[in-house]
Design a protein with these regions (language model features):
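Non-heme di-metal
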Residues: 2-372
Length: 372
């Protein structure tokens, strides 16, 4: 090893030390650190600290999209509408992804953190955690073309989009083909570091159960968990058209169907997939974008405030319960949290039926965490 190489390694180690101390790191920084050619020259405990930080970011990313998808779902008047069913499945799968990310973090001694009432906690509108898709701001609103454009950006595949040429709302910010700032890219870096570091993985406090959550205690299961997340969300990196089955569309292609008002169908002659059958857009409550900080008591009627406050209280309790599942609560706490999440609609939907005086659109939930 020559002097230049030794200096590079020292500089990288110093960078790792500074990164561990710094609380807020971008997704790109996590990817760069885990993928750096000198990562193997770093002390194992420090590499483990970076991996834990990266997995915590994955947990925040998986959870961060759920409220905006729930708003879209609840705004659909007929909950049996095919599009409502599709979005409901997306939410359920995002919960699965969250559970798998929490299991991966717990497997190496980390503690998933979601409940955060400090100014650094999740508040809408917001950027995706870690600087993923920095051009995008997550907003709480009903189902419409603007929200669908945001959903497509969130679920943008890391690999090629093969149904047809895709130009999204933020196409000037992306070079389509290989996308380096996607959630899939983050998981690729996580998988590679698990393989390289080969940490001891413990099943303690992980969750497994009937909804296909499973304990990750070796690299094979890590790889399975990450592949599952990628394929259900953005779509498989190496997917071919034969991999896409109509009833198993990734989130990106499900949202693309709704945006195009067309179902993706396979041509029995050519074997190619394209947009064919009309997909009627559902009748929705016109939920307006929730303002920064949410709706305040002084600005709304007592009816709106009661619904808003009850929603926030229940939501906060749900998040607290969800987080406890990977501490002491286990499967029972997770089931309780999921049940609470879907019960939030009894406050959200009545809000969505109330027009905002003097403005366009209706009210909706603010998804505020309350300290209790």
């Amino acid at each position: 090893m020559n002097t230049t190489e030794k200096k590079e390694i020292k500089n990288f180690r110093d960078r790792i030390d500074k990164s561990i101390i710094r609380k807020q790191k971008s997704m790109q920084e996590h990817i760069e650190l885990l993928s750096h050619k000198n990562i193997r020259e770093v002390d194992k405990e420090k590499r483990l600290a970076i991996l834990k930080s990266t997995l915590q970011q994955a947990v925040e990313l998986e959870f961060g999209t759920i409220p905006i998808y729930l708003c879209a779902l609840w705004s659909i008047k007929d909950n049996l509408d095919p599009i409502a069913k599709s979005i409901r499945n997306v939410v359920q799968e995002e919960m699965l992804h969250l559970a798998l990310a929490c299991n991966m973090l717990t497997s190496i001694g980390g503690i998933p953190k979601i409940y955060d009432t400090t100014p650094k906690g999740l508040r809408y509108p917001t950027k995706l955690p870690g600087g993923v898709h920095p051009e995008l701001t997550l907003k709480l609103s009903g189902l419409n073309d603007d929200s669908l454009d945001d959903f497509l950006e969130i679920e943008l595949p890391q690999g090629e989009i093969f149904i047809e040429e895709f130009k999204g709302k933020y196409h000037d910010a992306n070079e389509h083909g290989e996308h380096s700032n996607t959630i899939g890219a983050l998981y690729t870096a996580i998988q590679n570091e698990f393989e390289s570091l080969n940490p001891t993985m413990l099943p303690d406090k992980q969750i497994s159960g009937p909804l296909a959550w499973f304990v990750v205690d070796d690299f094979k299961k890590i790889k399975s968990a990450i592949n599952w997340i990628k394929e259900q969300g953005e779509g498989a990196i190496e997917a071919t058209e034969e991999d896409i089955k109509i009833h198993e569309l990734s989130h990106f292609y499900r949202f693309l169907e709704v945006r195009k008002r067309k179902k993706i169908e396979k041509d029995p002659v050519t074997g190619k997939y394209s947009f064919k059958i009309d997909l009627p857009f559902p009748d929705v409550w016109p939920m307006a974008v929730v303002p920064e900080g949410g709706y305040l008591k002084k600005d709304v009627s007592s009816e709106v405030w009661d619904l808003t406050h009850q929603f926030d209280l229940t939501y906060s309790s749900m998040i607290h319960t969800l987080e406890s599942a990977w501490d002491q609560g286990g499967q029972a706490a997770l089931w309780k949290a999921i049940d609470m999440m879907f019960n939030l609609e009894k406050f959200a939907i009545p809000l969505m039926k109330i027009p905002i005086p003097g403005k366009k659109g209706n009210y909706g939930p603010s998804f505020r965490l309350i300290k209790y």
